[in-house]
Design a protein with these regions (language model features):
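N-terminal auxiliary segments of SAM/dcSAM-dependent transferases
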Residues: 48-147
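Conserved class I S-adenosyl-L-methionine
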Residues: 187-198
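Conserved SAM-binding loop of SAM-dependent methyltransferases across substrates and taxa
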Residues: 199-213
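Conserved beta-strand signature within the Rossmann-like core of class I S-adenosyl-L-methionine
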Residues: 288-296
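S-adenosyl-L-methionine
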Residues: 226-256
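Class I SAM-dependent methyltransferase Rossmann-like catalytic core
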Residues: 148-183
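A short SAM/SAH-binding and catalytic strip from SAM-dependent methyltransferases
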Residues: 260-274
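C-terminal lobe and adjacent flexible extensions of AdoMet/dcAdoMet transferase-like proteins
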Residues: 361-495
Length: 495
């Protein structure tokens, strides 16, 4: 009698293998379950070879058909395709945190975009009628975003959008993913849904942030002409980054299964009911997954993102704000204006932006069509209760921003999240801060620089700070509270 392992081992089929021509031009139907079963067995024994599996499948399909089937099933099976065409168990460790600080938009992606531009307009795409048309599309996109108008994407608008936004969107997503990776909460092999994927900047940033040995099942939802650009840009990704583009609206698309990351990058402001859409996709989130929402730093889109966050994650609800705007007091949610954004180092100007900018009108400033500032608002939401920093206020120790009115002119101790870079235009540094209970804006104003209060300046966006002996004042001109950090104030970064 054979042992259990032998009983489960693959069996060779009797029929001969289909010829090359038949398999490549008219691929036979393949027993997908048999491919999966054989792969599950072999993965524990040796590298999974499509040539070998083909011998075990009824009808002996061509190895190329088996390989394609394995690629389609690789994420579910936890298999990584090697350069030699065989498949091995994927590394299941979380994605490591990266020192993400890109200096430039990668050349391979720049060349891919320029290929599209040359294919549509010719080698001199940036001059003449085509250049004028692209510049007009960029002007209109910027105006529509500023005014909050509906944004329409034809082929010219999609390419103009790609020229202007691919680099900064590429950079921004990596910084946001670091919030998850630093706590080992970013899967190395995620299933990703990119809602409103646009022309692919966030997808490419995600691709480059994850390690080379990751196995990714990436799905994009993009109904506009931007999907054509997205398709071309995704062609630059590695073989284990499997991509599918769904040309449907966010409202119409029906998620299939669960996703580890649901990404909304610069799309919430374009939806009629963004909170309802986010709620819909929260239902498709894995139990330990994250919704990652990113928006441009301008006032309207930034505040709009925070409004969505607050609507889908009310105080004591089932959705937790993981970062950056932590709620430090249980039972409270903020209701201030909510304009808050991070600032990272600028990118080098890519050649395609420089060329488009050189053809600007005489009355336009240099750099009108250059966009290398990396400034963005974001929100990471989870349903498992995880937070980037598990810090909460103690009423016996700290004042609460919800009750700041009664502390005016007093020195207090305060626990707060740093929610901006230096906003000052004068001598005193100014930083937006919050504790998740605030109804109006609060700002830390550093009037005296000391070693003991340096953390207010040195801390990163999203860090939690303890302020000791900070002076609370009301700023009537700004309609906000100023927390004065002077030589009597101690500021410590909690984490």
């Amino acid at each position: 009698m054979k042992g259990d392992a032998d009983a489960d081992a693959p069996r060779r089929a009797d029929s001969s293998r289909a010829g090359d021509g038949d398999s490549l031009h008219s691929p036979p139907m393949i027993d997908r379950d048999a491919v999966r079963d054989n792969a599950k067995y072999l993965r524990n024994v040796r590298p999974v070879d499509p040539d070998e599996i083909a011998d075990y499948i009824e009808g002996a399909p061509h190895p190329a058909v088996v390989k394609q089937t394995l690629r389609e099933e690789a994420h579910d099976l936890g298999l990584f395709e090697r350069d030699d065409g065989t498949f091995v168990p994927a590394n299941a460790d979380p994605a490591p945190v990266r020192n993400w600080s890109p200096a430039a938009f990668p050349d391979d992606y720049s060349f891919a975009l320029e290929d599209l531009l040359i294919g549509r307009y010719g080698a001199n795409w940036h001059v003449g009628e085509s250049g004028d048309r692209l510049r007009e599309r960029v002007r209109q996109l910027k105006e529509d975003y500023y005014r909050g108008n509906p944004v329409e994407y034809d082929e010219d608008a999609a390419l103009g959008y790609a020229i202007y936004h691919l680099p900064d969107y590429y950079a921004a997503v990596g910084y946001v993913l670091s919030d998850l990776a630093e706590r080992s909460l970013l899967p190395r092999n995620p299933r990703v849904l990119d809602v409103g994927a646009g022309t692919g900047g966030p997808a490419l940033g995600l691709h480059d942030y994850l390690p080379d040995d990751s196995v990714v099942d990436y799905h994009a939802v993009e109904p506009s002409a931007s999907a054509d650009v997205l398709d071309r840009m995704l062609g630059e990704t590695r073989r284990n980054f499997r991509t599918t583009v769904h040309r449907e609206t966010a409202e119409a698309f029906a998620p299939d299964g669960e996703y580890d990351i649901v990404l909304f990058a610069s799309v919430l402001s374009e939806l009629d009911d963004p909170a309802a859409v986010v709620r819909k996709y929260l239902d498709a989130l894995a139990a330990d997954g994250a919704v990652v929402a990113i928006a441009p730093a301008d006032r309207n889109t930034s505040i709009g993102l925070r409004e969505v966050e607050r609507e889908v994650a009310p105080a004591d609800g089932d959705v937790t704000v993981y970062s950056p705007a932590l709620r430090l007091w249980d039972g409270y949610a903020p209701s201030d204006r909510g304009w808050s954004f991070d600032v990272r180092p600028d990118l080098d100007v890519p050649g395609f932006q420089r060329r488009l900018d050189e053809g600007r009108a005489g009355d336009e400033d240099e750099g009108t069509f250059v966009n290398v500032d990396v400034q963005y608002s974001y929100s990471v939401l989870r349903t498992d209760g995880e937070r980037r920093l598990d810090v909460r206020g103690n009423p016996a120790r700290f004042a609460k921003m919800a009750e700041m009115e009664r502390h005016v002119t007093n020195r207090i101790d305060l626990l707060a999240v740093k929610l901006s870079h230096d906003l000052s235009e004068g001598n005193n540094q100014v930083f937006k801060i919050g504790d998740g209970s605030e109804a109006v804006d609060h700002y830390a104003v550093r009037t005296r620089d000391t070693v003991l209060n340096a953390d207010v300046a040195d801390a990163d966006y999203g860090d939690v700070l303890v302020f000791e002996n900070v002076l609370s004042l009301w700023n009537d001109d700004e309609g906000a509270y100023n927390l004065v950090v002077d030589d009597e104030t101690l500021v410590d970064r909690v984490a």
